[in-house]
Amino acid sequence: MTFSMDEWMKQYTCEVQKLFHDRIWFLGLQGSYGRGEANEHSDIDAVLILDAASVDDVNAYSQMLDTLPNREKVCGFLSGKKEILSWEPSDLFQFCYDTIPILGSLDELMAGIDESDIRRAIRIGACNVYHMCVHNLVHEKNADLLKGLYKSAGFTLQAIAFWQTGSYTKKKTDLLPLLREDDQVVLKTVIQLKEKETLSMEELQKYSEQLLNWASKWICEV
């Protein structure tokens, strides 16, 4: 049977409302399904923020998810309201822009984010990519790890485009024209690597060098 994200979210929302009633502060969807880029391997990134989230709430939520179809695909985010309002702002920038609201609003979170938080998101993203790229070249030499780093770079490129242009776009194809030429090269590789199952050692070296140089530039520039 064909999977319908709309039908799944309707069932999910109904079950969450039965479980938590008026304790729901926000419910939404993010990730590849939210961006319209999902494939058969994509996770379901549901977002739920409660008035407060105890361990009992977390366990009850997990048990509720066990009753839903496609349980193995469910990922996402669960927290209490006070925690998300006190969250690292550089994380919240993309969290807010990447999440489709179904119940509630993230406007209160967005109000606390400024340009310095976006620059910090870029710097942290570039630093993490740089560190793991070096680690992979020295120790792992793993193609899947490198592909994951390019995926992370794609999120950093979203922040870069927003910082430079004021426009936020979820889809990579729409993001491309917002970027400078050197950043476009990295994003094109992000898209290409999604279609490649394996990499030769020569490709691993080539793509690692490209990513390392890109991350280095942004660490120093921003």
Q: What positions do the PLM features span?
A:
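Catalytic core of pol beta-like nucleotidyltransferases
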Residues: M1-K18, D22, G34-E40, D51-V222
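Short glycine-rich or small-residue beta-strand-to-loop segments that form or flank ligand, phosphate
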Residues: V47-I49
